[in-house]
């Protein structure tokens, strides 16, 4: 049954009943009968407000009905997600532009955060946190400070122990509750995190943290999990979680603009690809002690935020001519995994046509007596004075009758199927081979005869 529409006359009836005590004592039918005579005497101008009110009521009812079905809810959710994304991008752009306009872009401070979790609810975005790390970073100073802690939530979602065990064993390898490590008081932990973020960004400022786009939902859920037991959370600061990859893109564009460099080739796809390469993934000494001992440094949150800081340094500090400091901009111990060879080193040895990295003297193993950094002249001298002579192993001699040296291609018939004629043919062909390739036939005394030997024996 279609819903009834609001009319201008009924709007007038309802208003008359609300304003007159006599109308409030009447039934709806009596009020309609009484107001009908009054409505007939009213002109178009007097009826106008009531007719307009009836149309507005119909529109409001239709909008309410559409929002109650599935399509209305989906559209609303998509609208909210789009607005949230645009608001996040505008906020990131404003943060970077404000630092640029104040000529302090290299000193702008950003906080990177990462969470590990035990399990996720099947039907909702509820994550049970297991580990947290935050890093304060600026282009000029690199890593300013790191906050890292493990989390013991006390229990995991009922019925998801197997999922939690599988996720833990394939990622961070942290023990599950009730044997979990770290802080057990969620309220205390959340306040410590808020205090750290406030110290990094200043009191009274909005708490903004950055994490990869695919982790934003998980990080927001973990923050909600930690603050749910805090009785004073309504009056506290709200933590905003933004996309670190979009920050990298905007910051790179502005850095190149400040350095007066061409940024036409810089786009979101290029910066995302650079970030996801994770060049410092296997760097030692940047994870917590637990993950260092268990060889799970890749999944350690402390290692994650540190690697992101190194990635920002690697991508932008060179554009601003910022001197990098080991342990802050790059790993404290960096071992080069390459060897520089002069482009014309092979031309110094004219007798060799097979020069390569492995054929050059001393390229494979570094002698202890030689210094690490050698000059170009010393490198040329060592190559020229070497007695190394490359050998050409591409030519060799072999017996054509040896099956092991020349394996048959396909189904080669065995010699036992050829008979006497085939054997004789092979012996004849062997006589045409070079001397050093002929078969050595075993001989006996009967194969040799001496002239006159038989006659002497007879006598």
UniProtKB/Swiss-Prot annotation:
<keyword id="KW-0678">Repressor</keyword>
<dbReference type="GO" id="GO:0008298">
    <property type="term" value="P:intracellular mRNA localization"/>
</dbReference>
<dbReference type="InterPro" id="IPR036910">
    <property type="entry name" value="HMG_box_dom_sf"/>
</dbReference>
<dbReference type="GO" id="GO:0007283">
    <property type="term" value="P:spermatogenesis"/>
</dbReference>
<dbReference type="GO" id="GO:0000976">
    <property type="term" value="F:transcription cis-regulatory region binding"/>
</dbReference>
<dbReference type="GO" id="GO:0051663">
    <property type="term" value="P:oocyte nucleus localization involved in oocyte dorsal/ventral axis specification"/>
</dbReference>
<dbReference type="GO" id="GO:0048471">
    <property type="term" value="C:perinuclear region of cytoplasm"/>
</dbReference>
<keyword id="KW-0943">RNA-mediated gene silencing</keyword>
<dbReference type="GO" id="GO:0008104">
    <property type="term" value="P:protein localization"/>
</dbReference>
<keyword id="KW-0963">Cytoplasm</keyword>
<dbReference type="GO" id="GO:0060964">
    <property type="term" value="P:regulation of miRNA-mediated gene silencing"/>
</dbReference>
<dbReference type="GO" id="GO:0031023">
    <property type="term" value="P:microtubule organizing center organization"/>
</dbReference>
<dbReference type="GO" id="GO:0005634">
    <property type="term" value="C:nucleus"/>
</dbReference>
<dbReference type="GO" id="GO:0007010">
    <property type="term" value="P:cytoskeleton organization"/>
</dbReference>
<keyword id="KW-0805">Transcription regulation</keyword>
<dbReference type="GO" id="GO:0016325">
    <property type="term" value="P:oocyte microtubule cytoskeleton organization"/>
</dbReference>
<feature type="region of interest" description="Disordered">
    <location>
        <begin position="43"/>
        <end position="78"/>
    </location>
</feature>
<dbReference type="GO" id="GO:0005737">
    <property type="term" value="C:cytoplasm"/>
</dbReference>
<dbReference type="GO" id="GO:0045892">
    <property type="term" value="P:negative regulation of DNA-templated transcription"/>
</dbReference>
<dbReference type="GO" id="GO:0007140">
    <property type="term" value="P:male meiotic nuclear division"/>
</dbReference>
<keyword id="KW-0469">Meiosis</keyword>
<dbReference type="GO" id="GO:0043186">
    <property type="term" value="C:P granule"/>
</dbReference>
<dbReference type="GO" id="GO:0010586">
    <property type="term" value="P:miRNA metabolic process"/>
</dbReference>
<keyword id="KW-0238">DNA-binding</keyword>
<dbReference type="GO" id="GO:0009950">
    <property type="term" value="P:dorsal/ventral axis specification"/>
</dbReference>
<dbReference type="GO" id="GO:0048600">
    <property type="term" value="P:oocyte fate commitment"/>
</dbReference>
<comment type="similarity">
    <text>Belongs to the maelstrom family.</text>
</comment>
<dbReference type="GO" id="GO:0007317">
    <property type="term" value="P:regulation of pole plasm oskar mRNA localization"/>
</dbReference>
<keyword id="KW-0217">Developmental protein</keyword>
<keyword id="KW-0221">Differentiation</keyword>
<dbReference type="Pfam" id="PF13017">
    <property type="entry name" value="Maelstrom"/>
</dbReference>
<dbReference type="GO" id="GO:0046843">
    <property type="term" value="P:dorsal appendage formation"/>
</dbReference>
<dbReference type="GO" id="GO:0000122">
    <property type="term" value="P:negative regulation of transcription by RNA polymerase II"/>
</dbReference>
<dbReference type="GO" id="GO:0031047">
    <property type="term" value="P:regulatory ncRNA-mediated gene silencing"/>
</dbReference>
<comment type="function">
    <text>Involved both in the piRNA and miRNA metabolic processes. As a component of the meiotic nuage, plays a central role during oogenesis by repressing transposable elements and preventing their mobilization, which is essential for the germline integrity. Repression of transposable elements is mediated via the piRNA metabolic process, which mediates the repression of transposable elements during meiosis by forming complexes composed of piRNAs and Piwi proteins and governs the repression of transposons.</text>
</comment>
<dbReference type="InterPro" id="IPR024970">
    <property type="entry name" value="Maelstrom"/>
</dbReference>
<dbReference type="GO" id="GO:0030718">
    <property type="term" value="P:germ-line stem cell population maintenance"/>
</dbReference>
<feature type="compositionally biased region" description="Basic and acidic residues">
    <location>
        <begin position="63"/>
        <end position="78"/>
    </location>
</feature>
<dbReference type="GO" id="GO:0034587">
    <property type="term" value="P:piRNA processing"/>
</dbReference>
<keyword id="KW-0539">Nucleus</keyword>
<keyword id="KW-0804">Transcription</keyword>
<dbReference type="GO" id="GO:0007314">
    <property type="term" value="P:oocyte anterior/posterior axis specification"/>
</dbReference>
């Amino acid at each position: 049954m279609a819903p009834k529409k609001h009319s201008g006359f009924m709007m007038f009836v309802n208003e008359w009943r609300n304003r007159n005590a006599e109308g409030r004592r009447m039934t709806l039918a009596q009020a309609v009968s009484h107001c009908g005579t009054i409505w007939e005497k009213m002109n178009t101008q007097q009826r106008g407000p009531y007719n307009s009110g009836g149309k507005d009521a119909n529109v409001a009812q239709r909008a309410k009905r559409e929002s109650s079905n599935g399509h209305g809810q989906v559209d609303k959710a998509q609208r909210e997600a789009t607005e949230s994304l645009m608001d996040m991008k505008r906020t990131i752009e404003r943060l970077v532009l404000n630092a640029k306009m104040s000529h302090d872009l290299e000193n702008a401070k950003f906080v990177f955060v990462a969470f590990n979790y035990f399990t996720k609810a099947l039907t909702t975005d509820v994550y049970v946190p297991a580990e947290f790390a935050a890093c304060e970073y600026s282009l000029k100073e690199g890593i300013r400070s790191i906050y890292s802690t493990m989390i013991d939530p006390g229990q995991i979602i009922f019925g998801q122990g197997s999922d939690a065990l599988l996720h833990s064993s394939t990622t961070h390898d942290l023990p599950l509750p009730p044997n979990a490590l770290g802080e057990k008081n969620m309220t205390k932990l959340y306040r410590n995190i808020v205090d750290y973020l406030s110290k990094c960004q200043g009191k009274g400022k909005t708490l903004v943290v950055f994490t990869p786009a695919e982790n934003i939902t998980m990080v927001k859920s973990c923050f909600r999990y930690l603050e749910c037991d805090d009785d004073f959370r309504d009056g506290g600061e709200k933590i905003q979680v933004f996309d670190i990859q979009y920050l990298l893109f905007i910051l790179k564009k502005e850095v190149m603009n400040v350095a007066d460099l061409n940024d036409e080739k810089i786009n979101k796809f290029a910066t995302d690809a650079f970030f996801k390469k994770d060049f410092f993934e296997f760097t030692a000494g940047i994870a917590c002690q637990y993950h260092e001992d268990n060889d799970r440094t890749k999944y350690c949150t402390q290692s994650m935020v540190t690697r992101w800081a190194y990635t920002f340094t690697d991508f932008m500090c060179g554009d601003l001519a910022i001197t990098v400091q080991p342990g802050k901009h790059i790993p404290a111990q960096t071992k080069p995994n390459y060897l520089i060879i002069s482009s014309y080193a092979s031309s110094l040895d004219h007798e060799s046509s097979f020069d390569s990295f492995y054929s050059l003297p001393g390229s494979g193993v570094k002698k202890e007596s030689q210094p690490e950094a050698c000059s170009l002249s010393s490198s040329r001298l060592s190559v020229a004075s070497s007695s190394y002579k490359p050998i050409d192993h591409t030519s060799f001699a072999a017996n054509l009758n040896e099956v092991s040296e020349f394996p048959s291609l396909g189904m080669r018939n065995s010699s036992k199927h050829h008979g006497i004629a085939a054997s004789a043919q092979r012996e004849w062909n062997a006589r045409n081979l070079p001397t050093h390739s002929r078969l050595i036939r075993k001989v006996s005394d009967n194969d040799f005869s001496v002239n006159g030997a038989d006659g002497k024996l007879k006598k």
